[in-house]
Regions:
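Glycine-rich, anion-gripping cofactor-binding loops and their flanking helix/strand elements
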Residues: 62-153, 228-260, 272-276, 307, ...
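Short, solvent-exposed amphipathic alpha-helical segments in soluble enzyme
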Residues: 1, 27-29, 68-81, 137-142, ...
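Cofactor-binding loop segments of dinucleotide-utilizing enzymes, especially the Rossmann-like FAD-
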Residues: 14-15, 61-62, 87-89, 127, ...
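Cofactor-pocket helix-loop regions in the catalytic cores of large enzyme subunits
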Residues: 2, 13-98, 175-243, 275, ...
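Thiamine diphosphate
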Residues: 221-406
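Phosphate/pyrophosphate-binding active-site segments
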Residues: 9, 13, 25, 126, ...
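Short coil/turn connectors at secondary-structure junctions
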Residues: 5-9, 52-55, 78-83, 117-121, ...
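Conserved thiamine diphosphate
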Residues: 1-5, 104, 115-118, 122, ...
Length: 406
């Protein structure tokens, strides 16, 4: 069952006496089943949609977000004019120089609606139709526009990569060159440190073949833009909205790939869920650089509190999302678990700390003291901007989306 399509995590429940009883005889491991590709008729119908001249987008997920799948999808896009998107929180996304770019659906539902509004067809490739992360008053949760038809290339038990290659052939794109971005790092930032400048410095200094575990929340909104043309890397994101998974995921990545540098980004609030991962990083001597983006607030939850209509929250309720009293000393927290750590509040200091961490193998922590903002906007203003997107012309809405969350 565990090896058959669609292979997923399985749980084996054993009786307690297995610990002291005689072991069973070894057996031959079963051969993993081979998943079929999508039916030829399905592929042909979707090829017709792609060749119809209508505005069409492919929404990618799962294993097709690795380089081979992205190259196949890019061939289709270059041949047919379709746009490429991926899930809000991809499990694993390969990206950077020489890997075709794919735009992530925005976390904020209002901005996701702006992204999808122009399309008449949405083709799902190992992905689900996008929905909002939470339910909001007077807002729809299903984000596909009413005028847009959804098509599904594969079912869960089918091989998405084989099916995507079949679609490449069906639209005669096998000899079409995928669009491959060149290496183009941003410059190192200067001046007062902000979350955007942290992301800029990462793009400027990221090592080749790195793995990024991104749980930066509101502070990481500029990371995709500043690392799009950085050296090739893997991005692991917050699947399922499980705040606190970022540091343990970084541990898992470093154990699985000991020859690759790992970068873990975490907000101060999310880092407190699983700070014991710092001890594991030291105990296992893992090559992980941890960046804590410390704005002394559960900023993402403050935004969501207002967006769900919880108006007039009292001081006691607000204090539960305030991390300034008492302030958390992440340097002391890391050092108490044996980790080299430093705190910075200037871009120059952050650049130097990140260069040193990447240069020296092993676990390091950098606490970046940053203001509570969203791409330069005070977070209090964000819900009001989002609420206005429905009432402005589409070109202006797109411009706002590109400015706030590129």
């Amino acid at each position: 069952v565990a090896a058959g399509p669609p292979a997923q995590i399985s749980t084996l429940i054993l009786p307690a006496d297995v610990s002291w009883s005689d072991g069973a005889a070894a057996t031959t491991a079963p051969t993993a089943g081979v998943s079929p590709a999508a039916a030829g008729e399905v592929v042909a119908n979707i090829a017709k949609v792609l060749n119809s001249g209508t505005k069409t987008a492919l929404l990618l997920g799962g294993r097709v977000l690795r380089e081979e799948g992205l190259r196949a999808a890019s061939r289709i896009a270059e041949k047919t004019g379709a746009r490429l998107f991926c899930e809000v929180f991809p499990t694993r996304l390969q990206r950077g120089a020489s890997v075709p770019h794919v735009e992530r659906i925005a976390y904020l539902a209002e901005m996701a609606s702006v992204q999808l509004e122009e399309f008449e067809n949405l083709i799902l490739v190992d992905a689900k139709a996008p929905v909002s992360f939470f339910a909001y008053p007077d807002k729809k949760s299903y984000l596909v526009p009413e005028h847009c038809t959804v098509h599904k290339l594969v079912e869960p038990e089918q091989d998405a990569l084989k099916s995507l290659h079949a679609l490449v052939d069906a639209v005669a794109a096998a000899h079409t060159q995928p669009k491959l971005p060149a290496l183009d790092r941003p410059s190192l930032p200067g001046g007062k440190l902000t979350a955007a400048k942290v992301c800029q410095a990462i793009g400027a200094l990221l090592p080749e073949n790195a793995i990024i575990s991104d749980e930066a929340q509101t502070s990481g909104v500029m990371l995709p833009a500043f690392t799009a043309n950085a050296p090739k890397h893997d991005l692991l994101t917050l699947t399922g909205g499980a705040i606190g998974q970022g540091l343990p995921v970084a541990v898992g990545a470093a154990v699985a790939c000991p020859d690759r540098p790992v970068l873990a980004l975490a907000g101060d609030g999310s880092a407190m869920y699983t700070n014991q991962a710092l001890w594991t990083m030291v105990n296992e001597d893992l090559d992980i650089t941890v960046i804590i983006l410390n704005n002394r607030s559960y900023a993402i939850l403050n935004v969501e509190l207002e967006r769900v209509g919880a108006e007039g929250a009292g001081s006691k309720a607000k204090s539960q999302l305030d991390l300034s009293e008492p302030p958390i000393d992440f340097v002391a927290l890391a050092q108490s678990q044996g980790m080299t750590a430093t705190s910075v509040s200037t871009s120059r200091g952050f650049n130097r700390a990140l260069e040193n961490a990447f240069r020296q193998p092993g676990p390091h922590l950098i606490e970046a003291i940053v203001p509570s903002e969203f791409k330069g906007l005070k977070l209090k203003a964000l819900p009001h901007i989002l609420g206005a997107l429905d009432s402005v012309p589409a070109p202006l809405a797109k411009a706002i989306k590109k400015k706030v969350a590129p």
